[in-house]
Amino acid sequence: MANSSFKLEHPLERRQIESSRIREKYPDRIPVIVERAERSDVPNIDKKKYLVPADLTVGQFVYVVRKRIKLSAEKAIFVFVKNTLPPTAAMMSAIYDENKDEDGFLYMTYSGENTFGLV
C-alpha cells in the first residue's frame, strides 16, 4: 500500500497527530483509510477516511464499503490489508492492532477482483 494517495497528500507528522487525536477522542474507534486498488474495475469510494467501531467485523466493514461505492449484489468485492485478504470474521480492532501503519491509521485497499491472489 506504498502508493496510498492519502499518504502522498498528507505528511507523516500530520497523519500521526491526526490519528492520535482521533484515538484519544474516540478510544473505541479505529481510524481507517480505504482506497481503491490500482487498475480495479469497481467505482471509487466517495470518502477515504473512516472511524470504525472497534467491535465491527471485517465482513461488516466490507458491507459498509459496498454501500459507499454502490456496488451491485452480483459483483464481488475484496478488501486487503497489506496485500492480504483478512478473515471476514476478524474484528477490526484485531486487524488494526496487527497491521496499523506507523502513522496510526489502518490502510485498506478494495478491488472487484482478488488482485493479490492471497487468501
UniProtKB/Swiss-Prot annotation:
Listed GO CC annotations: autophagosome membrane; cytoplasmic vesicle; microtubule
Tissue: Constitutively expressed.
Annotated CDD domains: Ubl_ATG8
Propeptide stretch(es), residue numbers: 118-119
Alphabetical list of Pfam families matching this protein: ATG8 (PF02991)
PTM note: The C-terminal 2 residues are removed by ATG4 to expose Gly-117 at the C-terminus. This Gly-117 forms then a thioester bond with the 'Cys-558' of ATG7 (E1-like activating enzyme) before being transferred to the 'Cys-258' of ATG3 (the specific E2 conjugating enzyme), in order to be finally amidated with phosphatidylethanolamine. This lipid modification anchors ATG8 to autophagosomes.
Principal localisation: membrane
InterPro entries referenced in this protein's UniProt entry, alphabetically: Atg8-like (IPR004241), Ubiquitin-like_domsf (IPR029071)
rRNA-binding keyword on record: no
Bilayer topology term: Lipid-anchor
Keywords recorded for this protein, A-Z: Autophagy, Cytoplasm, Cytoplasmic vesicle, Cytoskeleton, Lipoprotein, Membrane, Microtubule, Protein transport, Transport, Ubl conjugation pathway, Vacuole
Lipidation (Phosphatidylethanolamine amidated glycine): G117
A single BP term in Gene Ontology: protein transport
Annotated compartments: Cytoplasmic vesicle, Autophagosome membrane; Vacuole membrane; Cytoplasm, Cytoskeleton
Site (Cleavage) location in chain: G117, L118
Family to which this protein belongs: Belongs to the ATG8 family.
General function of this protein: Ubiquitin-like modifier involved in autophagosomes formation. May mediate the delivery of the autophagosomes to the vacuole via the microtubule cytoskeleton.
Subunit note: Interacts with ATG4. Interacts with NBR1.
Protein name: Autophagy-related protein 8c
Lineage: Eukaryota, Viridiplantae, Streptophyta, Embryophyta, Tracheophyta
Gene that this polypeptide is encoded by: ATG8C
